[in-house]
Regions:
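Active-site catalytic microenvironments in core metabolic enzymes, especially phosphate/sugar-handling
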Residues: 1-160
């Protein structure tokens, strides 16, 4: 399908300090490089099928189970915010309002302006933060056909 898939580790998803520490900063540099060289990248926050490594990490580190769905969007927001601050010239799809909220909170002084409906249930917005602009597609987490990502990528990445 042409996507580069990056699966986050439990530590990357749940450790609030990860991306401000040495390993996290190095990971962000590598991710920047991947995004700069590839038109289609997915950040996957799911555990491998049949594995609940994120929950095990949370238990081992004293993180309440109720914190998991809060910390994952915050981590995604940190990653996306970092890419926007670096000036990544791309469009992003965020599934679920929690992910979008995590990104906006991380960016601090950000403005999200709806541009229009890309497809039914998918909103295209302009995200501006510290003079950096990018386009963001948002949709509810459970909405859409199985081919949604590839169909969108085909439309967005098609030469004009």
């Amino acid at each position: 399908n042409g996507f580069v898939r990056i699966r986050l580790t439990p530590e990357q998803k749940l450790n609030k300090e990860y991306f401000s520490e040495k390993d996290g900063k190095e990971w962000l540099d590598k991710f920047w490089d991947i995004c700069s060289r590839n038109a289609k990248v997915i950040i996957d926050t799911n555990d491998p099928e049949g594995d609940n490594e994120t929950e095990r990490f949370a238990i081992a580190n004293g993180i309440p189970k109720s914190e998991i769905p809060v910390r994952i969007p915050a981590s995604l927001g940190c990653i996306i915010g970092n890419m926007v601050k670096r000036g990544l010239n791309s469009s992003m799809l965020m599934t679920g309002g929690d992910t979008l909220l995590g990104c906006i909170r991380n960016l601090g002084n950000a403005q999200l302006t709806p541009v229009g409906e890309f497809e039914i249930g998918i909103v295209l917005s302009k995200l501006i933060s510290d003079n950096n602009k990018t386009h963001v597609f948002t949709k509810s987490g459970g909405f859409g056909e199985e081919t949604l990502l590839t169909d969108m990528a085909d439309k967005i990445c098609r030469p004009a």
